[in-house]
């Protein structure tokens, strides 16, 4: 319990310090990235260019995630907004994120194939219950088991299968603290649309509120990941004694 309390308190303290220095600029930049992402999805996924637009939107989303990765790296590691070498890091993160997306896509294909026969076939549940179960399991796989892949990309500087392996090892070693500290972010992400599409209509005010709060909890996750991935329980025990 002492270790868990220390992880929470230090992560929150480090997050507050980063927000105190560059909080407004950070939230505005993250909001801009989110807005551009939504705008691109709406524009390129409709009308006559829908088929070609799907491909264009895919690369735009990766580019925007690359921008977000650079912003998050600077805020998590150095408590500052990026202002140099932006082009290099965009290209760097773009490749890592694209490779990771490809691996996740393969995992989703395998999951869809398995869930079709197991959930929709063997379980004999009705269509609604089968769909809810399928979405819930996909949420657990993508957001909890593999949920730290983005932090692995922008903090550990890896991508593709290496990022997925890192996420698996990380959750195995830090399941309880990472799950607990990720709960607010996952709730906000769920409320913003995502996995609830088709099940629940989320009002516009809630979407706006989540767009403001999500960057804060993304930063909290990043700070927690940095602490947990760079230390063991023994090291954190020493840090507690030293700081006290």
Model features per residue range: what roles?
Residues 1-244:
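Hydrophobic alpha-helical membrane segments
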């Amino acid at each position: 319990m002492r270790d868990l309390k220390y992880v929470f308190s230090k992560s929150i303290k480090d997050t507050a310090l980063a927000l105190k220095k560059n909080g407004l600029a950070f939230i505005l930049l993250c909001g801009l990235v989110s807005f551009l992402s939504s705008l691109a999805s709406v524009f390129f996924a409709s009308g006559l260019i829908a088929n070609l637009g799907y491909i264009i939107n895919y690369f735009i989303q990766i580019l925007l995630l690359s921008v977000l990765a650079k912003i998050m790296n600077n805020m998590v590691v150095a408590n500052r907004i990026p202002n140099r070498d932006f082009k290099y890091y965009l290209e760097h993160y773009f490749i890592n994120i694209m490779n990771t997306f490809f691996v996740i896509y393969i995992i989703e294909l395998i999951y869809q194939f398995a869930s079709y026969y197991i959930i929709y076939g063997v379980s004999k549940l009705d269509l609604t219950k089968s769909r809810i179960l399928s979405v819930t399991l996909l949420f657990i796989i993508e957001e909890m088991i593999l949920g730290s892949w983005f932090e692995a990309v922008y903090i550990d500087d890896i991508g593709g299968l290496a990022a997925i392996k890192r996420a698996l090892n990380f959750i195995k070693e830090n399941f309880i603290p990472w799950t607990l500290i990720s709960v607010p972010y996952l709730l906000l992400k769920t409320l913003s649309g995502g996995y609830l599409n088709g099940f629940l209509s989320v009002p516009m005010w809630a979407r706006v509120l989540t767009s403001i709060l999500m960057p804060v909890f993304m930063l909290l996750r990043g700070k927690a990941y940095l602490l947990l991935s760079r230390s063991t329980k023994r090291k954190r025990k020493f840090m507690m004694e030293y700081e006290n």
